[in-house]
Curated annotation (Swiss-Prot):
Binds 1 Mg(2+) ion per subunit. HAMAP family: DXP_synth. GO terms for biological process: 1-deoxy-D-xylulose 5-phosphate biosynthetic process; isopentenyl diphosphate biosynthetic process, methylerythritol 4-phosphate pathway; terpenoid biosynthetic process; thiamine biosynthetic process. Keywords: Isoprene biosynthesis, Magnesium, Metal-binding, Thiamine biosynthesis, Thiamine pyrophosphate, Transferase. This is 1-deoxy-D-xylulose-5-phosphate synthase. Pfam families: DXP_synthase_N (PF13292), Transket_pyr (PF02779), Transketolase_C (PF02780). Belongs to the transketolase family. DXPS subfamily. Mg(2+) binds at D146, N175. GO terms for molecular function: 1-deoxy-D-xylulose-5-phosphate synthase activity; magnesium ion binding; thiamine pyrophosphate binding. Homodimer. It comes from Anaeromyxobacter dehalogenans (strain 2CP-C). Pathway: Metabolic intermediate biosynthesis; 1-deoxy-D-xylulose 5-phosphate biosynthesis; 1-deoxy-D-xylulose 5-phosphate from D-glyceraldehyde 3-phosphate and pyruvate: step 1/1. Its EC number is 2.2.1.7.
Length: 636
């Protein structure tokens, strides 16, 4: 007998499956997700924990007329399998394959594109309001999980949804985990309520009482009055009911039959409803369930039998690990240094700091705005905070960077992990914009290390600097250079790392880790008789205009390279400097290489760098074109 999953090419096919067979279908989905994530990597734990919710929703609601909005998107793998993408699922997170997150262009069933947390309620409310305005039929469901309720925007959405009173269903997928274990008073409150003997005993007694009393309007009125008076003291739902939602739960998020019955009832309920489902992240796969740190959150390739990562050939340490070690050294030597992250202790490497300095390491939850202003408050009182955060997530705290930190010239260090192209996570997670959006902030020092030692020096420099500073470094391994003791760099001073005797043909100014590709291109061009100098600017702001302009004038041709967006980025900073120094009027030839004005899709990082034209081959080609173009015009 074939798999049930093989008979499902759309949600309409799923509706034909008897409810009694849904548990078997859920098991088939889990097996396929595990096998695929072992090969491709991905968000295993969240997707395994939400299988029954996915199946029950699609069994009851009619997508795409009914809109299912997934928060973050980590838990939507089963959704993809049930909406016509079963055969393509093996390609997820690979070049030319399915995206790792819901994307509107990929399927009509992906109602809203996601990748960052806490957006589902607001988006879903907008959709249900649009249906009211246009008269279009259909329900809207927001599935909020992975700790997204620790994000402030989720409560902003709840607040308006409760006020408007529309027929919005919010499913709270409560697995007590975000990427790392949930933190904060709200999470602690939920945990205590569910663990409370009083709470669980009260629920049992109420159920027994309801089954024993006579039915009738008068009896029901008395019961309702008693329950409402009591539940404010013992149920977690009072928080959501205070925001105008009807609260249902908590229910077993792995009882697919029970979920189907519940969704059928809630589909016809009038007004905003929040269904609280208790799930286990990594459900059905022991290695993920037993991983207390992340429950199989974002895994690379792993062995299905053991759950352990497939070991690659030994190589250099990842920049994330090097940063974490360097930060721990700084915290050991300076008690004023503290570390802050937004639900990313594991991802940013700060788990090492948390283990060694638990009282000086803060995980604030998915609350990037709060993280930055919290750091500002610490800095006001003489503390040296380091905010470690993925580049893509710092975008959420841009106003706080400007208003709360830079405007007050506070000594906050921003450590931006995943700066540049990130690979399989794709469009929503590319760190493409940080150089541009930070370069324009007055008084902020912006650094891009080219290797491990430069990262160590820049972190140390930022902690000695009496003002805001940021350093951004890429995903992946370093260059494998021998480590040096950290030292203070002179702010605003770059370095000439490759010189040539006499007059060079081209000067390449390569920001950050693009330096390696620039040096490789220079070596290849030397074999062709093209003399290339290479500058490591170190600082994107303040720029070493004296060095860069001198080398550009010397060569009369310059290529800038950055793993960031061209619009407003490092190359633009160089152009502005060339203009100020009159080099453009003097005929300086310039080529800027970087990420073009588009969102870069998922693939291996090396392929992405080739796509956008910042690998060694592309740099060499730009130099050849610049030399050939100017020689063709008779310019030396």
């Amino acid at each position: 007998m074939g798999r049930l999953l093989d008979t499902i090419d759309s949600p309409a096919d799923l509706k034909k499956v008897p409810v009694e067979q849904l548990p078997a279908l859920c098991q088939e989905i889990r097996e396929l997700i595990i096998q695929t994530c072992a090969r491709n990597g991905g968000h295993l734990g969240s997707s395994l924990g939400a299988v029954e919710i996915n199946v029950a929703l699609h069994h009851v609601f009619a997508s795409p007329q009914d809109k299912l909005v997934w928060d973050v998107g980590h838990q939507a793998y089963a959704h993809k399998l049930l909406t016509g993408r079963r055969d393509a699922f093996r390609t997820i997170r690979t070049e030319g394959g399915l995206a790792g997150f819901p994307e509107r262009h990929e399927s009509a069933h992906d109602a809203f594109g996601v990748g960052h947390a806490s957006t589902a309620i607001s988006a879903a409310l907008g959709m249900i309001e649009a249906k009211r305005v246009t008269g279009e039929p259909g329900k809207v469901v927001a599935v909020v999980g992975d700790g997204a309720m620790t994000g402030g925007v989720a409560f902003e959405g709840l607040n308006q949804a409760g006020y408007l009173g529309r027929n919005l269903l919010v499913v709270l997928n409560d697995n007590e985990m975000s990427i790392s274990p949930n933190v904060g008073a709200l999470s602690e409150w939920f945990s205590k309520k569910f663990a409370s003997r009083t709470y669980n005993r009260w629920r049992r007694q109420v159920k027994e009482f309801l089954e024993s009393v006579p039915k009738g309007p008068e009896a029901i009125g008395i019961i309702r009055h008693g329950i409402n008076a009591t539940k404010a003291l013992v149920t977690p739902g009072i928080l959501f009911e205070g925001l105008g939602f009807h609260y249902v739960g908590p229910v077993d998020g792995h009882d697919v039959k029970g979920l189907v019955e519940t969704f059928q009832k809630l589909a016809v309920f009038d007004g905003p409803v929040l269904l609280h489902a208790i799930t286990t992240k990594g459900k059905g796969y022991h290695p993920a369930e037993s991983d207390k740190a992340t429950r199989g959150h974002g895994l690379s390739f792993f062995d299905v039998a053991t759950g352990k990562p497939v070991k690659k050939s030994p190589g250099a340490k990842a920049y994330t690990d090097l940063f974490a070690e360097a930060l721990c050294e700084e915290m050991e030597h300076d008690p004023r240094v503290v570390a802050i992250t937004a639900a990313m202790l594991e991802g940013t490497g700060l788990i090492k700091a948390k283990q060694r300095f638990p009282d000086r390491t803060y995980d604030v939850g998915i609350a990037e705005q709060h993280a930055v202003t919290f750091a500002a408050g610490l800095a006001c009182e003489g503390i040296r905070p380091v905010v470690a955060i993925y580049s893509t997530f710092l975008q959420r705290a841009y106003d706080q960077i400007i208003h709360d930190v830079a405007l007050q010239k506070l000594p906050v260090t921003f450590a931006l992990d995943r700066g540049g192209l990130v690979g399989a996570d794709g469009k929503t997670h590319q760190g493409a914009f940080d150089l541009a959006y930070l370069r324009c902030v007055p008084g902020l020092v912006l650094m891009a290390p080219s290797d491990e030692n430069e990262l160590r020096h820049m972190l140390h420099t930022s902690l000695q600097h009496d003002g805001p500073a940021a350093l951004r470094y890429p995903r992946g391994a370093g260059e494998g250079v021998p480590l040096e003791p950290a030292r203070v760099l002179e702010i605003g001073k770059g370095r000439l790392v490759r010189n040539v005797p006499g007059k060079p043909d081209v000067c390449v100014v390569a920001a950050g880790t693009t330096l390696k590709a620039a040096l490789a291109a220079a070596e290849a061009l030397a074999a062709e008789g093209v003399a290339v100098t290479v500058v490591d600017p170190r600082f994107v702001k303040p720029l070493d205009e004296a060095l860069i302009c001198a080398e550009a004038a010397r060569a009369k041709r310059v290529v800038t390279v950055e793993e960031g967006c061209l619009a407003g980025g490092f190359g633009t900073a160089c152009l502005e400097a060339f203009e100020r120094h009159g080099l453009l009027e003097a005929g300086l030839g310039v080529r800027r290489l970087g990420i073009p004005d588009e969102f870069i899709t998922h693939a291996e990082q090396a392929k992405q760098r080739a796509w956008v034209g910042i690998d060694a081959e592309a740099i060499a080609a730009a130099c050849r074109a610049l030399v050939g173009d100017r020689k063709a015009r008779g310019v030396a």
